[in-house]
Amino acid sequence: MCLAQCAARRLLAQVHGALKPAPKKPNWCWEMARPSSNMADFREVFAKAKHIAIITGAGVSAESGVPTFRGAGGFWRKWQAQELATPGAFARNPSRVWEFYHYRREVMLSKHPNAAHIAIAECEKRLRKQGRSVVVITQNIDELHRKAGTKHLLEIHGSLFKTRCTNCGNVTANYKSPICPALAGKGAPDPEIEDAAIPVEELPQCEEDGCHGLLRPHVVWFGETLDPDVLTEVEKELDLCDLCLVVGTSSVVYPAAMFAPQVSARGVPVAEFNMEATPATDRFRFHFEGPCGTTLPPALARHESEIIA
């Protein structure tokens, strides 16, 4: 990639680095033929790929029973996620926001990777032995890819199971259940339940020596910018890939919405696996409709040309 293209991409990352919805009609500036749903053709492309980038969204975890808090009915109590997942909401009512995230953490502790997560992890393990690479770039914060065994994982929106201190900035993995005594039994989503109104000093606190600052979930909230180091890694992997899969994502949240179209624009095959078409579908070479746990395993299974080590 030339220096001008690199500079342009970095500029896009700066402009669109904040988590926000994409326009209703993305202004893509390139045209392609209608995507194919021919699995045999995809498998031939897959067999030749050396560096595969897999971009995943909420749809890949839906079959694990993970609540998405998107669309109609996507409420926790009286609020939608967009009302709670903001710096302002946390500043105004950290107890309410922590109840919401505590509920999500507790739910996720009982969930397991589905066939799509496992297919990705097994593909990565198998291809690594052949000198080929797979990287997963996920918008999900549920860590199901990690549970499935994925090693090369970029979590662009953070993780439910990491905390960040609002005082010292320390980031720590945290799988405690409950995350603090005051949140035990709290966070039920019933709209009739009142907020627990937990005092700040009883909410999760930093355990670094002498700090005791208030912890927050280490996730990217609406209006916040993505970690520039993570974006740099994403950029590097997308520049390197010779095949890109977009799995279970609606392609309507920036900056992830532009990742695969940018890859497609430089001539790299992109395959979309989703329950329905998205605003970006026509920019890709392949589109496979249906549950990811059904469509993805045969797509990533061992090809007859692969040599078993």
Swiss-Prot record:
Organism of this sequence: Gallus gallus (Chicken)
Signal peptide: none
UniProt keyword list: Cytoplasm, Metal-binding, Mitochondrion, NAD, Nucleus, Transferase, Transit peptide, Zinc
Family recorded in the similarity comment: Belongs to the sirtuin family. Class III subfamily.
Coiled coil feature spans: none
Binding positions for Zn(2+) per the UniProt entry: 165, 168, 206, 211
Cofactor names: Zn(2+)
Disulfide pattern: none
GO CC aspect terms: cytosol; mitochondrial matrix; mitochondrion; nucleus
Top-rank taxon: Eukaryota
PROSITE patterns for the chain: SIRTUIN
UniProt domain comment: In contrast to class I sirtuins, class III sirtuins have only weak deacetylase activity. Difference in substrate specificity is probably due to a larger hydrophobic pocket with 2 residues (Tyr-101 and Arg-104) that bind to malonylated and succinylated substrates and define the specificity.
Deacetylase sirtuin-type domain boundaries: 36-306
Purpose: NAD-dependent lysine demalonylase, desuccinylase and deglutarylase that specifically removes malonyl, succinyl and glutaryl groups on target proteins. Has weak NAD-dependent protein deacetylase activity; however this activity may not be physiologically relevant in vivo.
Positions of the catalytic residues: 157
Transit peptide interval: 1-35
Subcellular localization(s) per the UniProt record: Mitochondrion; Cytoplasm, Cytosol; Nucleus
EC number(s) given by UniProt: 2.3.1.-
Major subcellular location class: mitochondrion
Binding of substrate, residues: 101, 104
Catalyzed reaction equations: N(6)-malonyl-L-lysyl-[protein] + NAD(+) + H2O = 2''-O-malonyl-ADP-D-ribose + nicotinamide + L-lysyl-[protein]; N(6)-succinyl-L-lysyl-[protein] + NAD(+) + H2O = 2''-O-succinyl-ADP-D-ribose + nicotinamide + L-lysyl-[protein]; N(6)-glutaryl-L-lysyl-[protein] + NAD(+) + H2O = 2''-O-glutaryl-ADP-D-ribose + nicotinamide + L-lysyl-[protein]
Cofactor note: Binds 1 zinc ion per subunit.
Protein name from the UniProt record: NAD-dependent protein deacylase sirtuin-5, mitochondrial
Alphabetical list of SUPFAM superfamilies matching this protein: DHS-like NAD/FAD-binding domain (SSF52467)
Amino acids binding NAD(+): 57-76, 139-142, 248-250, 274-276, 292
